[in-house]
């Protein structure tokens, strides 16, 4: 609010965020998109701090340009969790994914299903949900086994032999070498 008692656009962002938060039920989770200016504006630093101090801001994901048809500006995905475990009450996971995307066109970016799974894996590990992460690694192993015959030779053998997470690096290097030879 300025001296004329007018609410600024960025102040309106926090009015909306607080309104949204106040209607979230106990134990509920919610996510929404906000302009990146709502995340880094100095004018609303105190409001942002109060919101974070509730312990219910769970994850913030910074998204780069061109993710929406009508706006090309970056944004931030906010996720609230009123059922957040006590051990995480003083923590907020911030993921900078502004350069993690696939270009669909010169004016539109998106996340592939695998990129979404990777972003989800970061959140799962932050929340201590190791089983979901193990399931994702198993899906990667299965996919590597499906792709192995396409590469043949040393690359195919290394892809077929993937077992532990440490086996991915040599398999990846062999696969890249096989691609370069084509």
PLM segments and residue spans:
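A conserved structural/catalytic subdomain of Rossmann-like adenosyl-cofactor enzymes
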Residues: 1-182
């Amino acid at each position: 609010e300025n001296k004329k008692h007018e609410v600024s656009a960025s102040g309106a962002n926090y009015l909306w965020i607080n309104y949204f938060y106040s209607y979230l039920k106990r134990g509920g989770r919610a996510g929404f998109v906000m302009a990146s200016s709502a995340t880094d504006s100095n004018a609303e630093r105190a409001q942002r701090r109060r919101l974070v101090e509730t312990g219910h801001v769970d994850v913030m994901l910074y998204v780069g340009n061109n993710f929406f048809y009508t706006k090309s500006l970056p944004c931030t995905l906010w996720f609230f969790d009123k059922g957040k475990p006590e051990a995480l009450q003083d923590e907020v996971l911030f993921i900078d994914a502004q350069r993690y995307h696939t270009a669909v066109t010169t004016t539109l970016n998106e996340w592939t299903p695998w990129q979404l799974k990777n972003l989800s894996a970061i959140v799962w590990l932050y929340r201590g949900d190791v089983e979901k992460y193990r399931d994702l690694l198993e899906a990667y192993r299965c996919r590597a086994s499906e792709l192995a015959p396409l590469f043949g030779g040393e690359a195919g053998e290394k892809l077929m032999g993937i077992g532990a997470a440490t086996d991915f690096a040599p398999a990846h290097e062999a696969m890249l070498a096989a691609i370069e030879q084509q």
